[in-house]
Structures are given as C-alpha cells and as structure tokens.
Amino acid sequence: MTTVSRETHERLERFADLLVQWNAKINLVSPRDIAQLWPRHIEDSLQLAELIPEGKTITDLGSGGGFPGIILAIATGNPVTLIESDQRKCAFLREAGRICEARVTVIAKRIEAASPPPADIITARALAPLNRLLEWARPLLKEDGFCLFLKGQKAQAELTEASADWHMSHSIIPSRTDPGGAIIKVSDFKRVV
C-alpha cells in the first residue's frame, strides 16, 4: 500500500464514501469492483503520485469516476484538470473535488473539444489504446511534459503498435497493483511523417 499522510488518507476515505453513494445512482465503477475499491482503483491510481513532481499541472483524460485524476489531486496537492464528457459524472467529480478539498477543474466536454491550458503531465486510466491517447494528449501537453498511462496486460502490444505511428521516448513501469499491468510513461512524442 502507498504511504500517505493521515490527512490525505482521511480525504481519500471521504472520496471512497462519496463514490459508493453516487455509484448507486450512476455507474462510476462496476458494482463488483466496489468491494475492491481501495486496491483496484484507489491504490492503482495512487502509484502514479510518486512519479509526479510537486507543483506540476496535470490533465486527466476521461476522468469518469475520478481515477486517477481526483486521487492525484488529493495525494499530490497539484492542480488537476479533469476532462469528462458525461454530465452526470462531471457533477460527481465537482462534488468530489469540493468534499475532498482537491484542486480540480472539471471540463464537461469530449476530449477532442476541450482546450485547457497545456499541462505538464497528462494521465489516463482504462480509456483507450495508446495510439488514441497520444493523439488526444499531444495538443494538451506542454513541450517538455510527459504522459502517464495506466495500462493492463496489453501495454507492450499497445506500445509496439503506437511506435509505428509515433516517435517517442518511453518507459514501462510495472504496476504494483496489477501483476499483468504497467504504467507507460511517454515524452517527446510526435507523429511519424
């Protein structure tokens, strides 16, 4: 388990309680995952916090139930922009930000239509193949920024496929919460001409 301060743990507990309440009304996580909320979702998202320097801006793509965006805002204290097209999920994200005292801005638009200020870091979890994530991330990322994408067992295959379309610096960091999963860190990426 990732070590966090008592205050941060309390804020994460508030988030978990709120998510359980809202999940009864709107589908934020699958009902079978509620029992595994901490290891499956919160801990999985928390492992990114150690890779994020203090004070860096973050944009989370397809924020849904707040993973990893809200968790990172709580754990790091960094400002996080959450992009989510589902209005009901946006209402949840705003309430979670308020209840958990997290520095979040919620943009209720499709990723392609959103135009937040460029971020230092782009994150996403369980959203789309790497190729698509890079396409969405490129215009939203600062020149010297990087991306952190939580991926499952197909991480290496997605990286191989994306390498045909993108020049990039990358590394694969084994997931601490999913034996077959990985974090793909990407920087300096541009389309192959």
Curated annotation (Swiss-Prot):
Q: Which residues bind S-adenosyl-L-methionine?
A: 62, 67, 111-112, 125
Per the similarity annotation, which family is this? Belongs to the methyltransferase superfamily. RNA methyltransferase RsmG family.
Query: What InterPro entries is this protein classified in?
Result: rRNA_ssu_MeTfrase_G (IPR003682), SAM-dependent_MTases_sf (IPR029063)
What is the role of the protein in this entry? Specifically methylates the N7 position of guanine in position 527 of 16S rRNA.
Q: Which PANTHER family does this entry report, sorted A to Z? A: S-ADENOSYL-L-METHIONINE-DEPENDENT METHYLTRANSFERASES SUPERFAMILY PROTEIN (PTHR31760:SF0)
Tagged with keyword Phosphoprotein: no
Molecular function via GO: rRNA (guanine-N7-)-methyltransferase activity
Protein's UniProt name: Ribosomal RNA small subunit methyltransferase G
Question: Gene Ontology cellular component?
Answer: cytosol
Q: Which reaction does it catalyse?
A: guanosine(527) in 16S rRNA + S-adenosyl-L-methionine = N(7)-methylguanosine(527) in 16S rRNA + S-adenosyl-L-homocysteine
Q: Where in the cell is it found?
A: Cytoplasm
Known EC number: 2.1.1.170
Q: Which UniProt keywords apply?
A: Cytoplasm, Methyltransferase, rRNA processing, S-adenosyl-L-methionine, Transferase
| Claim: Glycoprotein is one of the keywords in the record | no
Primary subcellular site in the record, as a coarse category = cytoplasm
